Amino acid sequence: MNGDELPFESGFEVYAKGTHKSEFDSNLLDPRSDPIWDAIREEAKLEAEKEPILSSFLYAGILAHDCLEQALGFVLANRLQNPTLLATQLLDIFYGVMMHDKGIQSSIRHDLQAFKDRDPACLSYSSAILHLKGYHALQAYRVAHKLWNEGRKLLALALQSRISEVFGIDIHPAARIGEGILLDHGTGVVIGETAVIGNGVSILHGVTLGGTGKETGDRHPKIGEGALLGACVTILGNISIGAGAMVAAGSLVLKDVPSHSVVAGNPAKLIRVMEEQDPSLAMKHDATKEFFRHVADGYKGAQSNGPSLSAGDTEKGHTNSTS
């Protein structure tokens, strides 16, 4: 046993099946120069020392693996397995995508940093990998999206179904989602087939990015970079939420929202221009209170006379995103 090895490590087999360090190809980020992976391993070792009862759990989920992709694939495979979609099969799927796609490798890390920076309940990188279903669902979606784009649509839809069953988060594999995304809690989030989400967006629980129920083709919302969607927001139709906009909790949005603006209500009304350039990073959720003060202070005709969200108010360019 060397100086860096914990006492329990020599007593467990390596749980990760499939790819080993010697088999990494040139597409994989070098695990020897990955500061996030280094931090994750250090966190896991410290937690194992503090809580010995979890030592085998931490070893199996993190310390047995050579890189972040291996560890994440192992965790996702064990979370999503069922009697007809085995963990070993899922490991092959996740490794086959994550070990060879630099775009997904980048997104995995940017998303992880977003959870660590913006979610006060996320105590560490390792806690996101091991415990946070919003992170799990997002990374499993990324694999399903890759499969969808490769024409393996039945397998992608099977993954979508398992993600929805296990995590309560329904993301169509054809949706296009950027990186640096936070799905805080994640419960009840629904993202439709033609939705587009830009980089750096924060999404709270219960958010729906849906169609109107009657259209086909491009029918779902487009969310600009750095936007913040509060809890239980519903956005319907092929409309744009501008970059850096904030949609307050409980709002129903049916029209375009200007960039760097705050909207709230049912239907949503324009409240003010954002002071913060990146509300998704600030994670301030006070716009709903502002809206009700706005109503209580005498704007009885807000629905008919208040500033409306017309197409002319919006910057029409759709958001940059990764596919």
Curated annotation (Swiss-Prot):
Task: Name the source's superkingdom.
Answer: Eukaryota
From the UniProt record, report the name of the gene that encodes this protein: SAT2
State the family named in the UniProt similarity comment for this chain: Belongs to the transferase hexapeptide repeat family.
| Expression across tissues | Ubiquitously expressed at low levels. Localized in vascular tissues, particularly in phloem.
Q: Would you tell me the protein name for this molecule?
A: Serine acetyltransferase 2
Q: Where does the UniProt entry say this protein principally localizes? A: cytoplasm
Specify whether Electron transport is a keyword of the entry.
no
Induction of expression: By cadmium (Cd). Induced in roots under sulfur-deficient conditions.
A single GO CC term, please?
A: cytosol
Instruction: Describe, as the record does, how this protein assembles with itself and its partners.
Output: Homomultimer.
Q: Which SUPFAM superfamilies match?
A: Trimeric LpxA-like enzymes
Basic and acidic residues bias: start-end ranges = 313-323
| Location of this chain's protein in the cell | Cytoplasm
Provide the residue span(s) of the region labelled Disordered. 302-323
Q: Kindly give the PROSITE patterns that the UniProt entry links to this protein.
A: HEXAPEP_TRANSFERASES
Annotated Gene Ontology MF terms?
Answer: serine O-acetyltransferase activity
| CDD domains xrefs | LbH_SAT
Q: Which NCBIfam families match?
A: cysE (TIGR01172), EPS_EpsC (NF041874)
Catalysis performed (reactions): L-serine + acetyl-CoA = O-acetyl-L-serine + CoA
Q: In which pathway does it act?
A: Amino-acid biosynthesis; L-cysteine biosynthesis; L-cysteine from L-serine: step 1/2
